[in-house]
Amino acid sequence: MSQNTDSPVLSLAKDLISRQSVTPLDEGCQQLMADRLADAGFNIESMVFEDTTNMWARRGTQSPVFCFAGHTDVVPVGDLNRWHTPPFEPVVIDDYLHGRGAADMKGSLAAMLVATERFIKKFPDHQGSIAFLITSDEEGPFINGTTRVIDTLEARNEKITWSLVGEPSSTHKLGDIVKNGRRGSLTGNLTVKGVQGHVAYPHLADNPIHKAAPALDELARMKWDNGNEFFPPTSFQIANINGGTGASNVIPGALEVMFNFRYSTEVTAEILIERVLNILDAHGLEYDIDWVFNGLPFLTGDGPLLEATKAAIKKVTGTNTDPQTSGGTSDGRFIAPTGAQVIELGPVNATIHKVNECVKVSDLELLTDCYEAILENLLCK
């Protein structure tokens, strides 16, 4: 029998990737992690809400509480024929670990766990507490995942001091970028009402597309704010428009428009909603609109977590990391409102959600070292 020569982090990453945990499935990933965390002295709580599996694991009862946050679910693989290797059969080719979830984010989960095991072995009497908040519903509707766990913790007044989310934050090399905040996200589902009719008799109909076009143009041209030193200006984007029956001789009776704001801390969701409604009303539209609040903006400024992260990355990689707030949303948006400082640090994100997703094996080793150094910087003072 050949001996497994994989490093601890590579071996665990392979084990996690081999489990087909497409949202909201977990497929035993959390149990695998829980068994090892229990051996390291963690108290394990499984929190299952509807179709979602969550894990809250904690070692220690004192503050401050350092929490690794992440997800075991992955996005669907897409066209299997375009994968060079089977997506759930992890393999290393030229120092790259291939498989769905390698970068987003089973590689990070493996690095978190191995770093924690090493840290506890060195410092069994560390300060404060270490926790893991892991969900199988980050890539999906995010209804029964991290947000429900946070609600549970808040209800019993269990507070997180610092949270490191393992999202793939790096762009060109490991640690070149960390996310110390995220923009808010607000979605509007607008239905503009008209009167269906024959295109040859427009006076007997009311075309909602024609009515809505000037308002949509104004919304698209609007400057919502100027941003600030931490956030770019708020962005309004139309994501989907649907109107008509598919026939060239029918004026539609309604127009459906889906749009999204990614907004800075210079505005609130309430301000954006008010301004949108004012524009729609000014154009005399008859409409219905539903709003979906996807997350508030948050920012972790200079403080213990950001400083510990910067120092760890510099020590391990030699890189002076660049804190940014760009990109999409993450589960950090559910943790930050509790008052916790939140940072995202993970592998290079070049292949996430793509076919042939992969991560450098050497980056997983460096990421493990970074996570361990962050623990030392915060809990060994």
Swiss-Prot record:
Quaternary structure per UniProt? Homodimer.
Question: Would you identify the family this protein belongs to, as annotated?
Answer: Belongs to the peptidase M20A family. DapE subfamily.
Give the matching Gene3D superfamilies. Answer: Zn peptidases
Active-site residues per Swiss-Prot or TrEMBL entry: D73, E138
Q: What is the top-level taxon of the source organism?
A: Bacteria
Give me the residues that bind Zn(2+) 2, please: D104, E139, H353
Task: Spell out the CDD domains in the cross-references.
Answer: M20_DapE_proteobac
Q: Which residues bind Zn(2+) 1 per the record? A: H71, D104, E167
Top EC class, one word = hydrolase
Protein's recorded name: Succinyl-diaminopimelate desuccinylase
Query: Reaction(s) catalyzed by this protein?
Result: N-succinyl-(2S,6S)-2,6-diaminopimelate + H2O = (2S,6S)-2,6-diaminopimelate + succinate
Question: Bound how, and how many: what does the cofactor note say?
Answer: Binds 2 Zn(2+) or Co(2+) ions per subunit.
Q: Which UniProt keywords apply?
A: Amino-acid biosynthesis, Cobalt, Diaminopimelate biosynthesis, Hydrolase, Lysine biosynthesis, Metal-binding, Zinc
Q: What exactly does this protein do? A: Catalyzes the hydrolysis of N-succinyl-L,L-diaminopimelic acid (SDAP), forming succinate and LL-2,6-diaminopimelate (DAP), an intermediate involved in the bacterial biosynthesis of lysine and meso-diaminopimelic acid, an essential component of bacterial cell walls.
Tell me one GO molecular function of this protein.
zinc ion binding
Q: What pathway does the UniProt record associate with this protein? A: Amino-acid biosynthesis; L-lysine biosynthesis via DAP pathway; LL-2,6-diaminopimelate from (S)-tetrahydrodipicolinate (succinylase route): step 3/3
Q: Which InterPro entries match?
A: ArgE/DapE_CS, Bact_exopeptidase_dim_dom, DapE_proteobac, Peptidase_M20, Peptidase_M20_dimer, Peptidase_M20A
Q: Name one GO biological process term.
A: L-arginine biosynthetic process
Is Zinc one of the keywords?
Answer: yes
Q: Does the keyword Amino-acid biosynthesis apply?
A: yes
EC number in record: 3.5.1.18
